[in-house]
Amino acid sequence: MLVLLAATFFIYISRLTSTDALQLIQRGLRGKSETFDANATIVPEISESKRVIFGPKPTDLQHEEALVASYADPFKAALSIFKLLGANKFHQMTSSKTQLRYAFVKLRRWSQRPIAEPKRSWWQWRSKTGNKSRDDLAQKRGFRSWWSGRHKAKNAKRVA
């Protein structure tokens, strides 16, 4: 609480000009307690030279011109967009044209990837429908299923 009070006091004092601060101190020393009137309170205007503490920093003209110059090159502009998209793993290549080509390849592959289906919960499992022939099951399940089924059938014939 004390830190918050000190920070508020510092901001209040830093925004006062020296003459306003001197008048405030003299009023406090004289012990004049005036009634507060919101309409009579004059808020001192901030001069152009002072910058509000919480306001934005002034823009640097050279920085702005550098940004415009960087976007004048279409390869640099596209590369900055790809870096924002996360396709910036091509720093070992020197040419920005080559970097751009690989970034396009990466994004094309990413856009053509199969859409992953969410994992099904147990209540979303499909129920088994009807009796299917062994050939259909073997074709669906693959070679290992066919081999194990054949092996069981062969052993059943020997026992019988």
Curated annotation (Swiss-Prot):
Chain positions carrying an annotated carbohydrate: N39, N131
Q: Where is this motif: RxLR?
A: 27-30
Give a GO cellular-component term.
extracellular region
Task: Extract the coiled-coil ranges from the record.
Answer: none
Query: Which compartment or compartments is the protein found in?
Result: Secreted; Host nucleus; Host cytoplasm
**Which keywords does this chain's UniProt record carry?**
Glycoprotein, Host cytoplasm, Host nucleus, Secreted, Signal, Virulence
Q: What is its main location?
A: secreted
Q: Which residues form the signal peptide?
A: 1-21
Functional summary from the UniProt entry? Secreted effector that completely suppresses the host cell death induced by cell death-inducing proteins.
State the family named in the UniProt similarity comment for this chain: Belongs to the RxLR effector family.
Domain free text: Has the canonical translocation RxLR motif, but lacks the canonical EER motif, which characterizes most oomycete effectors identified so far.
Q: What is this protein called?
A: Secreted RxLR effector protein 83
Query: Which source organism does the UniProt entry give?
Result: Plasmopara viticola (Downy mildew of grapevine)
Organismal lineage: Eukaryota, Sar, Stramenopiles, Oomycota, Peronosporales
From the UniProt record, report the name of the gene that encodes this protein: RXLR83
